[in-house]
Amino acid sequence: MFEAVTPLLDEHAELERRLADPAVHADAALARTLGRRYAELGAVVVAHAAWRAAADDAEAARELAAEDAAFAAELPALQRAAEEAGEKLRRLLLPRDPDDSRDVILEIKAGEGGEESALFAGDLLRMYLRYAERHGWVTEVLDANPSDLGGYKDVSVAVKTRGAAAEGVWHRLKYEGGVHRVQRVPVTESQGRVHTSAVGVLVVPEAEEVEVAVDPNDLRVDVFRSSGPGGQSVNTTDSAVRITHLPTGVVATCQNEKSQLQNREQAMRILRARLHALAQEAADAQASAARRSQVRTVDRSERVRTYNYGENRIADHRTGFKAYNLDTVLDGDLDPVIQSAIDADEAAQLAATSV
């Protein structure tokens, strides 16, 4: 049982040996990649050891149960513990999203609803920043286009873990991509009527510079003056940067920093992440239908959830999750909502595979 564990245990031991070599740490990118994989496999090693111990305890009790009533009484609980440990290990052995240990770039864009949508985009930004704070993640606003009333027409944020982690930011935030709908009375509404607005969220794994080779000849770089609420110029120099990748048409813009050089660096980070995501989508499209069902069981391009302020209700339309604690969710208590998507994804994979 669990024959697939053996090569993973061997890989974990080999990574431990390599990470003990000081020469590996001379290459920061390599050390980070190996460290993340080591942490990911470490969870499998621990779960396998726990399952073996629980299975051995249950087997020993089973052998002694015929002779000793005390062991017979303990057997059901020991068998349940072994089954639960096996289920945890089985989930860890599911095909892993290769980007799960990565950091992300999260983009929030106001959509249907005008200024109210922009205000809700600001509310979502605060929610994600508070959620990141709860997890000890590091956030950095890469670009922001504020609206007249203090919301955001669009905003891009980098979210990073501190050091190597088996479950990176992408592991949890990848389920946030899609359309988020809000139902509430806007601050601009004088009659007290409830309006429905929508905000789009895009989450892409951040790519290392060495992973996405970009030919400078494939880029068109435009510079312009940064603008603030209402479109007024907030800088007297052409510091804002727009980079277009000509072969794909992918565009990244940044005007958040004071210097053109800084904005160009941030725009390139966004561009690399988008190109990486584009390449991953192409690879998924070429995969078999069965494989796609394993790695993309929760569609991140569809309507994600509804936030109803009047009822203090949040509802996830993909998983059926519903709760009446919208105020705490908007304050960063997102884990139960996201966990419902993770559980649904893993359940679908378990149903489609035999691990």
Curated annotation (Swiss-Prot):
InterPro entries recorded: PCRF, Pep_chain_release_fac_I, Pep_chain_release_fac_I_sf, Prokaryotic/Mito_RF, RF-1
Gene3D superfamilies: 3.30.160.20, 3.30.70.1660, 6.10.140.1950
Sequence positions bearing N5-methylglutamine: 232
A single GO cellular-component term on record: cytoplasm
Signal peptide annotation: none
Post-translation changes: Methylated by PrmC. Methylation increases the termination efficiency of RF1.
This protein's UniProt keywords: Cytoplasm, Methylation, Protein biosynthesis
Domain of life: Bacteria
SMART domains named among the record's database cross-references: PCRF
PROSITE patterns reported in the protein's UniProt record: RF_PROK_I
SUPFAM superfamilies in alphabetical order: Release factor
Record localization: Cytoplasm
Keyword ATP-binding: no
One term of GO molecular function: translation release factor activity, codon specific
NCBIfam families (alphabetical): prfA, PRK00591.1
Stated role: Peptide chain release factor 1 directs the termination of translation in response to the peptide chain termination codons UAG and UAA.
Family, per entry: Belongs to the prokaryotic/mitochondrial release factor family.
Protein name, per record: Peptide chain release factor 1
Organism: Kineococcus radiotolerans (strain ATCC BAA-149 / DSM 14245 / SRS30216)
